[in-house]
Design a protein with these regions (language model features):
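Charged, terminal alpha-helix-loop-beta segments
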Residues: 1-500
Length: 500
């Protein structure tokens, strides 16, 4: 076989020197052949050598062995080196050497992984929908319609019937995938008007589908059919039943009252102007300045600090007072420096502070006290939103979700919390655990209030809310953009209602 012609430029020896120099400069080298999985390189799974006049590159791992003849290369960058290689039957192709420690190399590696998973997703669909036409399949971003490249999506068609499909990759968040799946379903229904797009097929990694399954149970089957599939590492796909995932990652700790003399030694700190004293459900007292906690009292002990906490002793009192003064100067609506870290930090906590102080402004039917934060607790930890649990004057619970910036996932994150509150309510656990003493709680499902600056509700919010079950009584409350100064309600919208 005659050799493939090499464009004029570097000799084979020079090409080898460039490759070796690039690899020596890499902190995290990897090899990428388009359409194949990324192959990390170590000194033990890679070789570059001359075989006669040919420069051969080989790389291997436990499942594959790659051998290519290198014929040319492009000018290298710090993050990647593009090679022209000869494959079987003299076919020419591209090969990339990447430094995953550099952002550009990591981005290309992620895109390659997305394309590989897209092809796995294609195989899933062929197996589950063998008689359907795979009309569209994409793993590219669509910013106009808020579609993420992290979750490949597809449109399946059979005559005048269609299905939306979306898959969560093995390392992805299956619960987040549902948000994008519902957006994709709505997009197809709006753009494929001659086809009845019946529902959404959601694919999730086996063992990680519970959060998505629980959310599916709270959607309206009349709005769309939703099918859940799980896949294994061996690409074995099974249809899942959301009703099989009834156990929740939630707990409800007993509600404890603080001791009568709790924190007497620290009353001077708690009484400082602008300090908020919030009693938590476990009896501890949180000391805050506009939502930002700087100290906590438990029994007669106080710990303080931003970030790293330490036990306070009497000689720390002056230091704590200076900390409060600093917070008061930086964390105020009248602050001159809006870029100051203490001003910008934890905006949801600041919004919570305003909501607690003016709960009846948000909804006149809500009792201002008691109001509980972060109960029930999530085993998964931080969720990026503030949860408050209140009760109205008739004894009906109300879940209040607070978000200071636009978040596509807010509706379904709020639904997570609503599901857990309803779970404990149905079992009578709030009353049994000491919450809302003296108030007879109604058995109706709780209300769900989404509170955010009016211009910060994500454009897809109405789309996702349109799929909620009628059992979920949801209301959006948009507050004025100057909410740090004053909490003013700009609109109230029920369900998926759109603002005029």
């Amino acid at each position: 076989m005659p050799p493939v012609d090499r464009p004029p430029g570097r000799t084979t020896v020079e090409i080898r020197a460039v490759i070796e120099a690039f690899l020596q400069s890499c902190r995290q080298p990897a090899l990428l052949e388009p359409g194949e999985e990324l192959l990390p390189l170590t000194g033990d799974n890679f070789s570059l050598e001359m075989r006669g006049s040919r420069l051969m590159l080989e790389a291997w791992d436990r499942t594959r062995n790659l051998a290519r003849r290198v014929t040319a290369l492009q000018e290298p960058s710090a993050a990647r080196l593009e090679l022209t290689v000869e494959r079987f039957a003299r076919r020419e192709g591209q090969l990339f050497l990447l430094d995953l420690a550099r952002p550009a190399g990591a981005d290309l590696g992620r895109r390659s992984a997305r394309l590989v998973f897209r092809e796995r997703f294609r195989l899933f669909l062929r197996r589950q929908f063998p008689e359907w036409d795979l009309a569209e399949l994409s793993a590219e971003a669509n910013l106009e319609f808020s579609l993420s490249p992290a979750f490949p999506r597809a449109f399946l068609r059979h005559g005048q019937h269609g299905w939306a499909a979306l898959a969560c990759p093995p390392e992805g968040d299956a619960a987040a995938a549902l948000s994008f799946g519902l957006i994709w379903l709505s997009y197809l229904r709006a753009s494929k008007r001659r086809v009845a797009v019946e529902g959404l097929a959601l694919y999730a990694p086996a063992g990680r589908e519970r959060a998505a399954a629980l959310r599916l149970l709270a959607l309206d089957p009349a709005a769309a059919r939703c099918e859940l599939f799980t896949y294994s590492e061996q690409d074995f796909v099974v249809r899942g039943d959301p009703r099989d995932h009834g156990n929740l990652d939630t707990r409800l700790d007993p509600c404890r009252r603080p001791a009568p003399n709790q924190g007497e030694a620290w009353q001077r700190i708690a009484a400082l102007p602008g300090v908020e004293r919030i009693v938590k459900h476990d009896g501890r007292a949180s000391l805050r300045v506009r939502g930002l906690e700087f100290a906590e009292i438990s029994g007669g002990d106080l710990i303080f600090g931003l970030g790293r906490r330490r036990a306070a002793h009497p000689h720390h009192a002056a230091e704590i007072e200076r900390l409060v003064e600093e917070l008061q100067r930086a964390r105020t609506p009248a602050a001159q420096d809006h870029a100051h870290p203490l001003y910008r930090q934890y905006p949801e906590a600041w919004l919570e502070s305003q909501a607690r102080a003016q709960l009846e402004t948000l909804d006149a039917s809500l009792l201002p006290d008691p109001v509980y934060g972060q109960v029930p607790a999530f085993a998964a930890g931080e969720r990026g939103v503030i949860d408050l649990l209140a009760v109205d004057r008739t004894g009906r619970l109300a879940v209040v979700e607070l978000k200071a910036s636009a978040d596509l996932h807010l509706p379904l994150q709020a639904l997570d919390y609503w599901i857990r509150v309803k779970w404990h309510l149905d079992r009578g656990e709030f009353t049994a655990s000491g919450y809302f003493p003296g108030i007879e709680l109604r058995p109706e499902p709780p209300r769900l209030l989404l509170v955010s600056p009016a211009l910060q509700f994500h454009p897809t919010t109405e789309t996702i809310l349109g799929y909620f079950s009628p059992v979920v009584d949801v209301e959006r409350i948009g507050v004025a953009e100057d909410w740090r100064k004053e909490l003013r309600v700009m609109f109230r919208l029920t369900g998926a209602e759109r603002p005029r």
